[in-house]
Amino acid sequence: MCAEIDERVNAFLARPIEGAWPYLWIDATYLKSRQAGRIVSVAVIIAVGVNIDGRREVLGVATGASEAEPFWTAFLRSLADRGLRGVKLVIADDHKGLRAAATKVFHASHQRCRVHWMRNALARVQPKQRPAVVALLKTIFAQDTAEAAHAQWRQVADTLRDRFPKLAELMDASREDVLVYMAFPRALGPDRLDEPARAAQPRDQAPRRRGGHLPE
């Protein structure tokens, strides 16, 4: 049974990728794996693409000991070798290695995942104050143009600065990374931008390294 499952999974992960996939979402979680008699932490990466028709599909999965640039580069090149092309925007958490690999392999821009960013932002706010802060942050993503979104971001950061200095500091440092998508076609709206990440982590909670075990 296990051999049959392995064969089907390997065939799925090695299948050719056809057509253009402009948007590529990448998410990572951590699991414990038994290797050579020891329990070690490994990164499990999943890549979800969206094609020009708006169809979503899991394009690849990989595991690795770290999330350094060589790992990301090897993973993205494996997708390219299977035929992945036309990638314009890679959406993921704030991984410097992934940012460099996306540029190297696909010449694509990197969009910081808004779901992860929002959780990081709210971790700097007391729970009872979060609804008001969320309402302010949402006004940024409701803007119709990149210029308006950047202006609203700065205004919201200044509004929050006195009460939430750590949140304002995060906003100052991450504005360009979170608003990259505003330079792309409006069809990639905020709701669609967040769909794969919400599906992967549906609960409204602070980010954490999820536990579990992979077989040896």
Sequence positions of predicted segments:
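RNase H-like nuclease fold core
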Residues: 2-91, 96, 104-108
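A detector of single, family-specific signature residues
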Residues: 9, 16, 52, 58, ...
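Amphipathic alpha-helical transducer elements in NTP-driven molecular machines
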Residues: 23, 41, 69-73, 92-99, ...
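Conserved beta-strand -> loop -> alpha-helix junction used to position metal-binding or nucleic-acid-contacting
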Residues: 28, 89-96, 101-138
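Short helix/loop capping segments that flank catalytic or ligand/cofactor-binding pockets
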Residues: 33-34, 99-100, 179-180, 200
